Amino acid sequence: YISRLLKPLGIVCSRLAYGIPMGAATTMMVSGEPLPEYVKCFVEDCGYTSVWDQFSKELKEQFGLPKFPLMHTASWLCDRTKGWNFTEASSLEQVKKCTLPMLFIHGEKDDYVPTWMVYELYQAKPEPKELWTVPNADHATSYKLNKKEYTEKVKLFTNKYIR
């Protein structure tokens, strides 16, 4: 959309893709796809490794239910009705293909999207990449608890790649 808008005007720009929770997952999902040349880097804050991992965690923690057979059945139904299954929606697989810089941010006390997920994502992503885990931050509160430091970290990261 942005390409169609800017191209006729002759506008050249550089952009980052940035997202928090579901936006973070979306940001990582697109990171492994072919992208317009104006996308220069990514910033994700508290994104999950995959829909499978996140749904499995929620089934167990919120409802005390095992992932088998519910996850398998739900994934199969999703595939039959929507054309995709839970294993396909994987931020982890997409960041493996990402060649652009990415800043990973995650609260160290996040128990909704567990902090272990950011370490798997960070390890899977080829360089260039940076990781900042935020002490005392739970889910999606890193900015709220550390506005100045958060802004500075994002600014320092993006200034390396966007001019």
Residue ranges with predicted function:
Residues 97-99, 104-106, 110:
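Short beta-strand/loop motif that positions the catalytic acidic residue
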Residues 9-21:
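Alpha/beta-hydrolase fold nucleophile elbow
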Residues 122-140, 153:
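Catalytic histidine neighborhood in serine/cysteine hydrolases
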Residues 1-9:
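Alpha/beta-hydrolase active-site loop
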Residues 108-113, 140-141:
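Acidic catalytic loop of the alpha/beta-hydrolase fold
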Residues 29-84:
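Hydrolase active-site cap/lid region
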Residues 91, 100, 114-123:
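Short alpha-helix in the alpha/beta-hydrolase fold that links the catalytic acid
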Residues 145-163:
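Catalytic active-site module of serine/aspartate enzymes centered on a nucleophile-bearing elbow/loop
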